[in-house]
Amino acid sequence: MQQVITQTLVDDRFIQISDSKKSEGLATDSTKRQSQEQPIHDKDPIKAATAAMATTPLVKEHQDTWYYPPDIANDLQSINLPAELKGEIFACAWEYTRCVIPNYTNWNRYVAFMRIIIMGIIAEFRGEMVDVTASNNLLGYDLDATLAALFEGTPGHKEMAREYKTFLLITADKASERRDGELFRRYVNALAQSPRHWFRMRDCDALARFTIASALACNDLDDIWFTEDQFEILTEIGDTLYDAVAFYKHRAEGETNSTFAYMPEDLRIKAYSECREILWALDAAWARNPKLANVINFVRFFGGPIHMMMRRYRFVEENLTIGKSETDKVVDQTRKNFKLWNRVDANKRSVLNTQRYKALIARSEELMFPGLAEFLEMGGDGICDKCKYRESTVQNCHTSLVVLNYAANADYRGEST
């Protein structure tokens, strides 16, 4: 393991502390100044203490030391990002990998998965740096070679390559100015077609089936694969659990792919409870099949515990609580990419860029999971008279989000709104 950097968050500013300063304790300019301004001698110690308290701001300090294996320490060498930010990205990728795939037998595949997650993290908050349509070289990685390092020899190699490229395509558009274009407009509108379409699109956005496939690959379980129906069930359970816990995080981010943004609040608790029960039932049913433990481990950790164990989430900052409503400060920090979060603010314009969109549809067998092109074509302009959609005009007053009502009204997963 390698210690990378220590950061302290003071009033939303990162202060790097050198090893020599660590032994001396934290001393920012403001605290030094306060100690100089306070009287050295005072006949009334109570008065002096009161004065000191009055001049000392209530600052919540939080210090992180990043750890990750040396295999990824020299990645992103040619990428223009601050060293401390790279350290946080590497640590986030390592922590996520350890949480969702806690067991592994193939270290090389495990490292490839970390690199996949590194690319994904950057796509989520620096979308302009990632364009899967332009080149196979992303952030200094050979994308196809990295995917091959993870999946070569598995039954899902080609399928998972398309899955991940779809994730990069949509996620990077969402986190960049490209979200003003025709592709993302249609993507957001298409979310409303049906619950089944919603969960398939959310599955890709969360890399849910991709991580299940990765867990199998990292444990050399190349003889196991799931049917489409099985993937849908597993990912719907995992995404429902995750989105229920991440509800306020998603709200702080203005996240379009948040299941419970589109249904009555009381359904969030009920859905989480039922999916958790199903997860434990499935776990018990598969208990004597150790090969399937890797799949259950992913769904279990993804469904909640990562919010406590990963430093990407605010469990420590919010006094060891989960499910705390976002504040203006949290939203502001999200805009500044604190904890690698990203705010998708509503846009007041939409760019009619149909040429790029048509070119991407033509490459859908390379850049989109099976069925997504049809989702975009069928539902890109909206199919429900009760929903509000982004219009395809140069200037409009609609937000970047589509307001859905399917989850509250649909009685079964295949029903359209």
UniProtKB/Swiss-Prot annotation:
Physiological role: Alpha-ionylideneethane synthase; part of the gene cluster that mediates the biosynthesis of abscisic acid (ABA), a phytohormone that acts antagonistically toward salicylic acid (SA), jasmonic acid (JA) and ethylene (ETH) signaling, to impede plant defense responses. The first step of the pathway catalyzes the reaction from farnesyl diphosphate to alpha-ionylideneethane performed by the alpha-ionylideneethane synthase aba3 via a three-step reaction mechanism involving 2 neutral intermediates, beta-farnesene and allofarnesene.
Pathway(s) annotated for this protein in UniProt: Hormone biosynthesis
Protein name as it appears in the record: Alpha-ionylideneethane synthase aba3
Changes seen on gene knockout: Impairs the production of abscisic acid (ABA).
The protein's Enzyme Commission number: 4.2.3.-
Species in which this protein is naturally found: Botryotinia fuckeliana
Keyword DNA damage carried by entry: no
Keyword Ubl conjugation among UniProt keywords: no
Keywords: Lyase, Virulence
Taxonomy, superkingdom: Eukaryota
Similarity remark: Belongs to the alpha-ionylideneethane synthase family.
